[in-house]
Regions:
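Rossmann-fold dehydrogenase core element
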Residues: 99-116, 136-140
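Beta-loop-alpha module in the N-terminal Rossmann-like domain of NAD(P)-dependent dehydrogenases
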Residues: 31, 39-103
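Short active-site oxyanion
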Residues: 20-24, 59-61, 170-171
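Predominantly a Rossmann-like dinucleotide-binding segment in NAD(P)-dependent oxidoreductases
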Residues: 117-202
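Short, small-residue-biased leader/transition segments that mark boundaries at the very start
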Residues: 3-4
Length: 202
């Protein structure tokens, strides 16, 4: 998101001021980082997270790494005194997530997680219809979601394997149900219980 905000001239605040993000890309593949930097005009990139976290001028750490790497990376950023903005899921387990929350609170930093799907055009329209009384009283809500992932034999797979392979730290349930939780909370009410079935069709 920061990349596109930079191209648009920064983030507009309510008083008309514009804030221009100065991102520092950190990843595992230097060739990809260099290509992204050149493509979007970002000069700062590194494969060394700890070195990047030492820069006092960078106050906010945004984590969009794979789920299995996230908890450790966020913990290192908290220890470096950075404010945290994090993709979901925050961690692979409730225990890890609660530990990160406790560490962030103890450090006295601001911390939050992505809730981007709340602002998808279709869901905003759904909320508008709900508020207008279009549906009447909702007694039951059902959401179905799936990834269409090309197998790679006839055409290249279009999603990285960690998005959907449990053994790579992903899986549609851990990757997506946390997003649908806040969608349901904000559109229809608090979730009281969950029943879930995940399958893979080839």
């Amino acid at each position: 998101g920061d990349v596109y905000k930079r191209q648009d001239g920064g983030i507009a605040l309510s008083d008309g001021t514009r804030v221009l993000p100065d991102p520092f890309l950190v990843g595992r593949d230097p060739k990809k980082l260099q290509r992204l930097g050149e493509q979007y005009g970002i000069e700062r990139w590194s494969t060394d997270l700890d070195a990047a976290l030492k820069n006092k001028d960078d106050e906010v750490y945004f984590d969009a790494a794979t789920t299995e790497l996230r908890a450790e990376n966020v913990q290192r950023a908290i220890a470096a005194g950075k404010h945290i903005y994090c993709e979901k899921p925050v961690a692979s387990s409730l225990e890890e997530a609660l530990k990160l929350y406790a560490l962030a609170e103890q450090a006295g930093i601001n911390h939050g997680v992505v809730q981007d799907m709340r602002f998808l055009p279709g869901l905003l329209k759904l909320g508008m219809l709900r508020d207008s009384g279009f549906f009447g009283r909702s007694l039951s809500i059902r959401i179905e979601f799936g990834y269409w992932v090309f197998e790679g034999d006839q055409q290249p797979a279009q999603r990285p394997s960690w998005n959907y392979r449990k053994e790579d730290g992903g899986g549609i349930i851990i990757d997506m149900l946390c997003h649908w939780r806040y969608v349901l909370d904000n559109l229809f009410g608090r979730v009281k219980s969950v029943s879930c079935l995940g399958t893979r069709h080839i």
